[in-house]
Swiss-Prot record:
Places the protein is found: Cell membrane
Record-annotated disulphide pairs: none
Signal peptide annotation: 1-19
Alphabetical keyword list: Cell membrane, Membrane, Signal, Transmembrane, Transmembrane helix
UniProt name for this protein: Uncharacterized protein MT0054
One GO location term (cellular component): plasma membrane
TM region positions: 90-110, 257-277
Organism annotation: Mycobacterium tuberculosis (strain CDC 1551 / Oshkosh)
Length: 289
């Protein structure tokens, strides 16, 4: 076997000594034996043989066979001179320390807010601030009683009231039309998705539309009508593709502040709608045609 497999090293030989073709061949023989003995898988053997044929130094070869059992000779580098080891370890340690100090210096230069790069005590992100996490639980299932009443409460918090021209409520979002306080000829439209977003403005003729309190209806009754609407219209609940509720002013001139609620249901087999008053009184039913 080659000298790096167990024979005494000649004077001046180290892991950095250049490997010869015979050394590479010896390494490949050891790897072949390890494959036959089951120490290496086919993939490990292929990778190591490829590396052995390209090895530059004895150290490169030694690393490829150091964990293998070799009967004819130990597959490891013999002990090198202690002075050479100390020199190599010293250089590695010095390089490591230098890289750490360089990294600390760069990090302090970019992010540091202290007089020294080794002083981390004033990092504001490392100090406890006593702020508790805030978990947001806005209403999402708006066709439920809790979701519907929660939506109206969110409206009061956002605008101070529930006045408006129209409120359209989908299962997980809603839209609201309100008067522009700066110009009563304009309508401000808002969308709710966990919270009321910013307004979009549009010029509309609203002379014949009243501003009403859009919360003045029986929410519990409305939810019950929504849940029974598919069966009311002769549709299967599993066939329903969309459902939404429109709340706007009633057209009856004798009750100017009253609301009219229109519930639209659609499916692949047709759709229909219901119209009812704020107290749940049914005004009209349009069955699927």
């Amino acid at each position: 076997m080659a000298k790096w497999l167990g024979a005494p090293l000649a004077r001046g030989v180290s892991t950095a000594t250049r490997a010869k073709d015979s050394d590479r061949q010896d390494a490949c023989r050891i790897l072949d034996d390890a494959l036959r003995d089951g120490e290496l898988s086919m993939e490990e053997h292929r990778e190591r043989v490829s590396a052995a044929t390209k090895a530059v130094t004895l150290g490169d070869l030694q690393r490829l066979v150091a964990d293998l059992q070799v009967e004819s000779a130990p597959a490891q580098m013999p002990a090198l001179k202690s002075r050479a080891k100390r020199t190599e370890l010293g250089l590695l340690a010095a390089a490591f320390v230098a890289s750490v100090l360089l990294g600390v210096g760069i990090g302090w230069g970019v992010y540091g807010n202290t007089r020294s790069p080794l002083d981390f005590t004033s990092d504001p992100g490392a100090k406890p601030d006593g702020i508790a996490p805030v978990v947001l639980t806005p209403p999402r299932q708006l066709h439920s009683l809790g979701g519907l009443t929660g939506l109206l409460e969110q409206t009061r918090k956002r605008f101070g009231d529930t006045m408006g021209y129209r409120l359209v409520i989908y299962p997980e979002y809603a839209s609201l039309d309100r008067v522009d306080p700066a110009d009563d000829r304009r309508v401000l439209a808002y969308t709710y998705r966990g919270g009321w977003g910013d307004a979009t403005s549009s010029a509309k003729s609203i002379a014949d539309v009243s501003v009403v309190d859009l919360s003045k209806f029986d929410a519990k009754t409305a939810v019950g009508i929504m849940r029974g609407a598919p069966e009311t219209l002769g549709l299967k609940q599993s066939d329903v593709k969309s459902m939404y509720l429109i709340v706007d002013p009633a057209k009856d001139p004798t009750t100017p502040a009253a609301l009219s609620l229109s519930l639209y249901v659609s499916s692949d087999y047709g759709g229909g709608y219901l119209v009812f008053a704020g107290d749940g009184t049914i005004k009209h039913v349009s069955y699927p045609s």
